[in-house]
């Protein structure tokens, strides 16, 4: 399969149609302004913004903290199980349209339990959407519970205990929210407990934080996958380790530009990550806030980086399946589908 023969003008359609997985999506970050307004009206809540347009205009944040401030405000409209279902269902419809065959979805229960929303309300709504997505859309999805790193480890232990009766409804835990001043080791004990429970482990590291945070996520949390991780290139020894151990990075290009991790997509290091042999993937992070779902991230990144071609598209999609937490047989089936798709593109030439 000689992918170098696929012309550059064929890339946009190829990127949109190829089967792929999404491994870094915060479900609360998929809340579009229209749905925020609809849920506020349904729950008789008064928003700080008089119109959908004024809310969308407020999305002009310039760093991670200013984004998080409006992100948590938007999440406040989620009150009932139906609200959580509607949010997840809207995302799954968008994912299906982008030819996502599998999604591993982050949710932030502490954002809601702190407002008095029962954990059961949150996870039952999300899980119902996932089951319906499997049955009606043919899309595979799983939940990853994220601890908020700006809160205490004691808070993380509390939400873990609340989650355990629903252990069959989520596959792992992650660590998100503001990196600065909240190093991975702050959560080493709760991650050790999650490891004992057989949960899969991921962590945000090396987005705002330094390469050292990635080392700590790997060594002190035993993270199997690093979310973001783009600062790894600052440390050649870390790059060697990531390549040797094939630790996946779930990279989010549009998010990185919106939050000023890179000045623009032309400066993004995703092509260099791939060239080093790192198992990098492309993801949307918080698509309602960062200007694009998964295909938009692929399209804009490939348009900005001429060194990315069909071979890199194949590698990114394959990486997304290989980095997922499904069993080997299912992964192999998806990779066969991917191979068939790319072979068909080659046969057209």
Curated annotation (Swiss-Prot):
Its cofactor is Zn(2+). One of its GO terms (biological process) is hypoxanthine salvage. The lineage of its organism: Bacteria, Pseudomonadati, Thermodesulfobacteriota, Desulfuromonadia, Geobacterales. The keyword Zinc applies. The active site is at residue 207. Its EC number is 3.5.4.2. Zn(2+) binds at residues 24, 26, 204, 285. This is Adenine deaminase. Catalyzes the hydrolytic deamination of adenine to hypoxanthine. Plays an important role in the purine salvage pathway and in nitrogen catabolism. Pfam families: A_deaminase. Binds 1 zinc ion per subunit. One of its GO terms (molecular function) is adenine deaminase activity. It is an enzyme of class 3 (hydrolase). It comes from Trichlorobacter lovleyi (strain ATCC BAA-1151 / DSM 17278 / SZ). One of its GO terms (cellular component) is cytosol. The record marks 228 as: Important for catalytic activity. It catalyses: adenine + H2O + H(+) = hypoxanthine + NH4(+). Belongs to the metallo-dependent hydrolases superfamily. Adenosine and AMP deaminases family. Adenine deaminase type 2 subfamily. Keywords: Hydrolase, Metal-binding, Nucleotide metabolism, Zinc.
């Amino acid at each position: 399969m000689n992918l170098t023969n696929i012309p550059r003008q064929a890339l946009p359609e190829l990127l949109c149609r190829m089967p792929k997985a999404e491994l870094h999506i915060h479900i609360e970050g998929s809340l579009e302004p229209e749905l925020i307004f609809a849920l506020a009206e349904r729950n008789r809540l008064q928003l700080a913004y008089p119109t959908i347009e004024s809310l969308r205009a407020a999305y002009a944040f310039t760093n991670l903290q200013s984004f998080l401030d409006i992100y948590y405000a938007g999440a406040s409209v989620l009150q009932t199980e139906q609200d959580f279902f509607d949010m997840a269902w809207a995302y799954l419809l968008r994912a299906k349209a982008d030819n996502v065959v599998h999604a591993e979805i982050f949710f932030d229960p502490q954002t809601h339990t702190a407002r008095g929303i029962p954990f059961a309300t949150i996870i039952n709504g999300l899980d119902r959407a996932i089951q319906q997505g499997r049955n009606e859309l043919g899309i595979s999805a799983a939940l990853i519970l994220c601890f908020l790193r700006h809160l205490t480890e004691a808070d993380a232990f509390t939400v873990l205990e609340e989650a355990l009766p629903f252990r069959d409804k989520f596959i792992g835990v992650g660590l998100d929210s503001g990196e600065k001043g909240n190093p991975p080791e702050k959560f080493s004990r709760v991650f050790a407990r999650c490891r004992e429970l057989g949960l899969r482990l991921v962590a945000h590291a090396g987005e705002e934080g330094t390469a050292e945070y990635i080392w700590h996520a790997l060594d002190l949390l035993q993270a199997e996958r690093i979310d973001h991780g783009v600062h790894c290139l600052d440390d050649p020894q870390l790059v060697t380790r990531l390549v040797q151990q094939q630790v996946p990075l779930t990279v989010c290009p549009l998010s990185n530009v919106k939050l000023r991790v890179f000045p623009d997509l032309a400066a993004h290091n995703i092509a260099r990550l791939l060239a080093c042999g790192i198992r990098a993937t492309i993801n949307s992070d918080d698509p309602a806030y960062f200007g694009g779902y998964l295909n938009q991230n692929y399209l804009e990144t490939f348009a900005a980086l001429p060194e990315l071609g069909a071979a890199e598209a194949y590698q990114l999609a394959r990486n997304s399946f290989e980095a997922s937490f499904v069993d080997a047989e299912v992964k192999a089936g998806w990779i066969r589908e991917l191979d068939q798709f790319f072979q068909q593109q080659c046969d057209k030439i």
